[in-house]
Regions:
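Bacterial N-terminal signal peptides
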Residues: 11-20
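Conserved glycine-rich phosphate/nucleotide-binding loop
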Residues: 344-392
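A conserved acidic, glycine/proline-rich C-terminal tail/linker
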Residues: 38-39, 282-364
Length: 392
């Protein structure tokens, strides 16, 4: 039986949810998301947080303690050289040092050197399975007509701060900027969460709204079904250049600003303080449901986590603000979906709608440039490209 109007409207709207000189930003972000002003990056105050970066030199990955930023480079200490550990996971190196030792190193600055921005690699975790929150900002929930935040899995390798994403024919590629988090240990309980070092980084959550339209569970939107298929893939999860470990994670998150620019025009601007579910709540719900809940993905069902724990190879995507491309379908489409006699008839309506949206070219197109940025977490630059030709 086709869903009723209220359910269908929510179904259509929720698709959108899942969606460098130092100048500190003190004011709350403006609601004028179409402005062109850019939130410039600054280093998180060293008395409240440590900022880490990584570079690859040959086969070795070096983990750095960042001391200063400029237009062309960062100034940092090589913690890998100091510890003798060259790990792809920054936390392996960071955990060789106490907070007090890091403070002393930052104060002394002995051995600090410059590293060019283009040499910085992504600081995301090395796994594929991540935890994502949908409609976790009130303004975004308002624009898509969904009051409650919900969770779903995202299956993607973490990319770096300079990436590409393919926008093929018929795809509706949308952008979302998010605050991401990862941990220095496996999280099996809230006690583990409270004790863990928490690292924050800016990330992108690209999605194909066409896939989401086809896969969405219209009867139960907050099940999250349809989101893993639409948001997973090799180029859907770019990560920023900085992993920031604060002493007070709640205060730090409350000061974060995130935004998206497309071809220089600001599309999204949000204050992380406005999240509905904070990081601890997301962890709690993930652990509580780990043994019982599954989500649809590639015509099967998958859990959020494979074991009853959040591993060090997983990240948490905490949601996005308003300003994504997707908008509620037009009245005729909604009526047609409501009147469809069965799922096959609904699919016909959905495919017609997807073709119409693709023809408008309002979603990301080849040659577009997307910039995700944050005041303390750095920036990600993504170039949208066409799929390779078959004759190449």
């Amino acid at each position: 039986m086709p869903p009723n109007r209220r359910t269908l409207s929510a179904a259509c709207l929720v698709l959108a949810s899942m969606t460098l000189p130092a100048v500190t930003i003190h004011a709350a972000p403006s609601t004028n998301t179409r402005a062109t002003a850019v939130t410039v990056a600054t280093l998180a105050p060293l008395d409240r947080a440590h900022t880490f970066a990584q570079v690859r030199e040959g086969d070795a990955v070096r983990t750095l303690l960042v001391l200063a930023l400029s237009d062309k480079n960062i100034t940092a200490l090589d913690l890998s050289a100091l510890s003798g550990l060259y790990s792809t996971d920054a936390f392996d190196v960071i955990n060789r040092f106490s907070t007090a030792q890091l403070n002393d190193l930052a104060s002394a600055k002995r051995g600090a050197r410059a590293y060019a921005w283009p040499d910085l690699i992504g600081v995301g975790p090395r796994g594929l399975a991540h935890i994502a929150a949908g409609t976790n900002y009130p303004a975004h929930g308002d624009e898509v007509g969904v009051a409650d935040a919900f969770l779903f899995p995202k299956i993607s390798p973490a990319g770096g701060p300079r990436t590409t994403i393919v926008a093929g024919p018929g795809a509706l590629i949308d952008y979302e900027v998010e605050v991401c988090a990862r941990f220095d240990r496996e999280i099996r309980s809230l006690h583990d969460f409270d004790e863990a070092r928490k690292g924050f980084f800016v990330c992108g959550d690209f999605s194909d709204r066409a896939t989401m339209m086809r896969k969405l569970n219209l009867k139960e939107i907050t099940s999250g079904d349809g989101f893993p298929d639409a948001k997973s893939g090799p180029d859907r999860f770019p990560s920023g250049p900085f992993l920031v470990v604060p002493t007070d994670w709640k205060r730090f998150v409350s000061e974060l600003v995130i935004e998206t620019h497309v071809n220089g025009e600001r599309r999204q601007l949000a204050a992380a303080a406005h999240m509905i579910k904070d990081l601890r709540t997301i962890v709690q719900e993930t652990l509580e449901d780990a043994a019982t809940r599954t989500w649809s993905y590639q015509d099967g069902r998958i859990p959020m986590v494979r074991r009853l724990a959040i591993g060090t190879d997983s990240a948490i995507l905490t949601g996005t603000g308003d300003g994504v491309v997707f908008q509620e379908p037009d009245t005729d489409t909604v009526k047609a979906l409501m009147g469809a006699k069965d799922r096959a008839a609904q699919i016909v309506v959905i495919e017609r709608y997807i073709a119409s949206e693709a023809a408008k070219r309002t979603y990301l197109q080849p040659a577009d440039r997307v910039r995700y940025s944050s005041n303390y977490l750095g920036a990600i630059d993504t170039r949208v490209i066409a799929p390779p030709r078959n004759d190449q």
